[in-house]
Every structure is written in C-alpha cells, then in structure tokens.
From Swiss-Prot:
One of its GO terms (molecular function) is ATP binding. Its main location: cytoplasm. This is Chaperone protein ClpB. Belongs to the ClpA/ClpB family. Induction: By heat shock, primary alcohols and monocyclic aromatics, and weakly by catechol.
C-alpha cells in the first residue's frame, strides 16, 4: 500500500466525518 493511497483514504475518512 503506497503512502499516497493511505493519505487519500485518510482524507476521504476526514471528509466523511465532517459530513456527519
């Protein structure tokens, strides 16, 4: 798993959390 993919996944999780 590349670091970029990890950050991308983390960013998406943060966006989802802000949506709540």
């Amino acid at each position: 798993m590349x670091f970029e993919x990890f950050t991308n996944r983390l960013q998406q999780a943060l966006s989802d959390a802000q949506s709540l």
